[in-house]
Each structure stands twice: as C-alpha cells, then as structure tokens.
From Swiss-Prot:
Protein name in UniProt: Transcriptional regulatory protein DltR
CDD domains: REC_OmpR_DrrD-like (cd17625), trans_reg_C (cd00383)
Localisation per UniProt entry: Cytoplasm
Lineage: Bacteria, Bacillati, Bacillota, Bacilli, Lactobacillales
Function (record text): Member of the two-component regulatory system DltS/DltR. Regulates the expression of the dlt operon.
Highest taxon, organism lineage: Bacteria
Record's comment on post-translational modification: Phosphorylated by DltS.
Gene Ontology BP, a term: regulation of DNA-templated transcription
Listed Pfam families: Response_reg, Trans_reg_C
Keywords: Cytoplasm, DNA-binding, Phosphoprotein, Transcription, Transcription regulation, Two-component regulatory system
Entry-linked SUPFAM superfamilies: CheY-like
InterPro entries per the UniProt record, alphabetical: CheY-like_superfamily (IPR011006), OmpR/PhoB-type_DNA-bd (IPR001867), Sig_transdc_resp-reg_receiver (IPR001789), WalR-like (IPR039420), WH-like_DNA-bd_sf (IPR036388)
Length: 224
C-alpha cells in the first residue's frame, strides 16, 4: 500500500516515514503544498497524511483542489492546530480524518488502517477513470456534480471500457461481451449504444471520452 506524507518539517516527515515503512507501507514525502498537490493528483496513493501549515500552498488549499479534481483519495490532516474551526473547515472541504500533533503512533496507525479499509470497501464496487466512476452495484455513471443511470447494455458496454481503459477494443469483442454470439445487425446497435454513452459522458462533463479507431474498434481515453 502506497502512502504520501506532506509535511514541511523534515524530521517529522522522516519519522512518520520510518514508522510506516516498518509496518510494510511504501511511503513518499513532499515538503510543500505545491509538490504535495502534484503528487496527489497522480492518483497513485492509497492515503495521504497532509499538514495544514505548508509552504507555497496550505493543506486546506491542497485538499480543495484535490476534491475539485474528483479524486477521493483518503486524506488525514496531521497538524499542530487544534482549534475547532480548523478541524471543521478541513472536514467540510472533504478531509476523512484529523489528528493533532503530538500524536500516539498506535493511534495514527489505527486511523490509517480504518480509512484505507473503508476506501477499499468503496472501491470494490466502483471502476474509475479520470473524473468518472462506474458504480457496479447501482449501474450509475457518476461525476462529482451528477450521476446518470445506465441501461443494462449501456452498463455492460461501459464496464468493458472501464476494465480495459486506454486499450483499443475490437468491435466484435465488444459485441460478444454485451450481446453474445452475434450477426452483422448488432454492429449498428453497438454504434447506437456508443452514441448513448458519449452523450451521457458529455452531460457529466467527463474528462474521458470514447475514441473510434476506424475499421477496428473503440477505446476509452482521458482527454489530453
């Protein structure tokens, strides 16, 4: 499991890194808000420990930008500030937890286990690319602002795209997975349902799109 610690006091950051590494976590460090934001937006981390008082960009600003980007990476504020206002402000912006320094190592580890466990349960029924999630339980396509219900075939088609993101999928393979053994008439149906999905992605203001590779198939790609 890969974690990120964003903390400007190098000695504290390295002590946390050593503690977590001893428990089997892979831990990266960032020492200011700009670097922390850049690291988080890669989407590589299972959880982030984020200080509020940081050079260049505050932890609150980092959190706000992360949530605006649609990332739901668990974030625990780790800060010397204990005022109720700071805690409430952070939680309202989308923080998952808040620990005040100095802290007990066992409490920090317990909170990390709790938040990563909860996140894993959420991810188990979601497929994600860019700012879009596909809920495999409700068959809804979701963005931060809205959601749309998919028909059965729309869902099956979108699930194939999400599970094979950024790969060109031949038309006959898509038809086989969604319609089963097919004849040529289903190629027209495929194009119709691709059109439906494209409209729904536009409605959700998605930063992903279904790309046509002429004469071969389709792929789900992030916009550049």
């Amino acid at each position: 499991m890969r974690l990120l610690v964003v903390e400007d006091e190098k000695s504290i950051a390295e002590a946390i890194q050593a503690l977590l590494a001893d428990k089997g976590y892979s831990v990266d460090l960032a020492f200011d808000g700009d670097d922390g934001l850049e690291y988080i937006l890669t989407g590589l981390y299972d959880l982030v420990l984020l200080d509020i008082m940081l050079p260049k960009r505050s932890g609150l600003s980092v959190l706000k930008r992360v949530r605006e980007a649609g990332l739901e990476t668990p974030i625990i504020f780790l800060t010397a500030k204990s005022q109720t206002y700071d805690k409430v402000n952070g939680l309202d912006l989308g923080a998952d937890d808040y620990i005040t320094k100095p802290f007990e190592a066992d409490e920090l580890l317990a909170r990390i286990r709790l938040r990563t466990r909860q996140s894993s349960l959420i991810r188990a029924n979601q497929l994600r690319l860019g700012n879009i999630r596909l809920n495999t339980d409700s068959h809804e396509l979701e963005s931060k602002e809205s959601s749309v219900k998919l028909s059965n075939k729309e869902f099956l088609l979108m699930e194939v795209f999400m599970r094979n993101a950024k790969q060109i999928i031949p038309k006959n393979q898509l038809i086989s997975k969604v319609w089963g053994p097919s004849d040529n008439s289903e190629y027209n149906q495929l194009e119709v349902f691709i059109s439906f999905l494209r409209k729904k992605l536009r409605f959700l203001k998605a930063d992903i799109e279904i790309i046509t590779t002429k004469g071969f198939g389709y792929s789900l790609e992030e916009r550049t």
